[in-house]
Amino acid sequence: MVLGLRSKIIPLPDHKLGNIKLGSVTNAICHRPCRVRCSHSTASSMEEAKERIRETFGKIELSPSSYDTAWVAMVPSRYSMNQPCFPQCLDWILENQREDGSWGLNPSHPLLVKDSLSSTLASLLALRKWRIGDNQVQRGLGFIETHGWAVDNKDQISPLGFEIIFPCMINYAEKLNLDLPLDPNLVNMMLCERELTIERALKNEFEGNMANVEYFAEGLGELCHWKEMMLRQRHNGSLFDSPATTAAALIYHQYDEKCFGYLNSILKLHDNWVPTICPTKIHSNLFLVDALQNLGVDRYFKTEVKRVLDEIYRLWLEKNEEIFSDVAHCAMAFRLLRMNNYEVSSEELEGFVDQEHFFTTSSGKLMNHVAILELHRASQVAIHERKDHILDKISTWTRNFMEQKLLDKHIPDRSKKEMEFAMRKFYGTFDRVETRRYIESYKMDSFKILKAAYRSSGINNIDLLKFSEHDFNLCQTRHKEELQQMKRWFTDCKLEQVGLSQQYLYTSYFIIAAILFEPEYADARLAYAKYAIIITAVDDFFDCFICKEELQNIIELVERWEGYSTVGFRSERVRIFFLALYKMVEEIAAKAETKQGRCVKDHLINLWIDMLKCMLVELDLWKIKSTTPSIEEYLSVACVTIGVPCFVLTSLYLLGPKLSKDVIESSEVSALCNCTAAVARLINDIHSYKREQAESSTNMVSILITQSQGTISEEEAIRQIKEMMESKRRELLGMVLQNKESQLPQVCKDLFWTTINAAYSIHTHGDGYRFPEEFKNHINDVIYKPLNQYSP
């Protein structure tokens, strides 16, 4: 059995794989030609795109924020309250009104009307305060009149703190004698709701709840305790890295040299506008690295990514304010650092360990859904049973929170999809399936939202889209060619004559291609897929067809190997199976010798002997003689017959790095292999228990129930196995990410994790081999259907 599966050889019907004709790949699934070659101009264009992407590291800019720029424009001069301190911001506002009279990121976006209303009103306040731009003011009022319906529309994406800030700006407009064309009843309702929100916050200030509205301090106006607020001023002079809030402190409180210095430093960078958050370096670099990984092209920028993560790690160790003052930054930094082999402690996330504490001590900036999503993602990378209990608690409350949010019928579709994806275990998905979905949903006009919507030029651009799409299609072309090779091999080995459908090739190859997808790993990928087919086939034979004597015959043939002709074949199916095995191992051994510079064939043969002898134990002692093994006895055998030692250790030789005999036989490799095999076996046993019970096959669930003498129910047995499985999974991830004293190259350690990822992925929606329709869609997406998001 392979990848945690003990599957019957059930042919997938032709209609389930898009009427595949086994003799012609051009008719397979999507009816597209197999070979696609890139022109010289295309290759050159992609190289140029790659260089432009490389240049974006450290140079990413956020879009101008009309909202924040307007607040900065309202700051009076330190020398005269009747003059603006930053007149250049007023000039920017005058020059950047949209044709419809609005200001904002994208007034035509159907879900950003509230954002446009907020930015427009802030801009009108700045113009009216300094008595300029009468024409622009009238046009802006016209926009508010025609779009005022969105103020209380629950289907709109709302800027953070809108319910506090927008009514405050309405009050300010009245003081400036700016008559807003809004429904008076709606205005009164908003003002009442704002007062109640502020009253609750001020009443519970000493209990921590005031933190919920501090980020929206410009919406508190004179009600804000600005003197106390200034105690939260950051080293860079800002309040919460927000230009708008910092500007409000200068408007409502008093002149502060550090606040002025902060705003002035931003304007030195951008001349006459400000973004909605600054500084942006850590923010932008984290999101860029995450985007590159999600797009599946981070391998092209290893040097740049490492440079960014090294810098983030240095700042992490220094407890840098820009990282730790923002929960989304902190959570994302933790996840990216841990998953890229940096040693980081989950104790740094202790402040977010429960929902109530999070919402009563976090500023409003931290409470947007992005922060919750990033916290949940960070909680999934636990590697310590005891040390990472903090992550378990975070995982529980963030999942519950998102589940409740998903019940809200007004939740924007964009947020809904993000939450649904975040709630899926990151180790229970096929990488290339998710990469395709990410590319398909990638939009150059994508935005994020704080108190104003914003976009990042370096993260949402045409180069990233074109480059990732081109790379996906190149890999896809390679996969189609490899699948053709697999089909020729399958036919040459006559495996159909022993009951194995050729259509099984698609699923077997897809499982590894969807995770170990890089072109340079073609040899390892093909070996892995072939082993998957042969191991699953022999396992099913022994379960249902082959007698004990035939298995003993196969073992003797493998033990003799070069002298197999002196042994003879007990049956035709034994002959077909052994010759397929022999040809496969000989071919792989030759390739491995070329890559390793030494002969490893004896090791490959011994791996098969060990597995076959363990299969004999399963067949003879446990099935024929109905002996029930102890848990220890069962795992010592079943973790070998699952196939992990055989196909993973074999594939290691083909990944590229040279591995000495000492490394292969090291305790590190042994521990990785044992842990991987245990997880794969336990995954298999949980999902195949009912079927194996009907077949009288031994299974971990049945052993626990039997040994308990009726004191453990089936549900309890499965719960205990899941606990064992989770413990082993974390242990494995910890070993894979551990750099200290590791002899094994990272790409080799990753293959063990890849194997577990595949096993979990297969069973995410049940036994993948028993749900061919879903796998048909996955195979189409990863191997056959080209991406075409970008249309030049």
Swiss-Prot record:
Its cofactor is Mg(2+). Residues 1-37 form a transit peptide. Expressed specifically in trichomes. PANTHER family: CIS-ABIENOL SYNTHASE, CHLOROPLASTIC, ENT-COPALYL DIPHOSPHATE SYNTHASE, CHLOROPLASTIC. Keywords: Chloroplast, Lyase, Magnesium, Metal-binding, Plastid, Transit peptide. It comes from Nicotiana tabacum (Common tobacco). It is an enzyme of class 4 (lyase). A motif (DDXXD motif) lies at residues 539-543. It is found in: Plastid, Chloroplast. One of its GO terms (molecular function) is magnesium ion binding. The gene is ABS. One of its GO terms (cellular component) is chloroplast. Its main location: plastid. This is Cis-abienol synthase, chloroplastic.
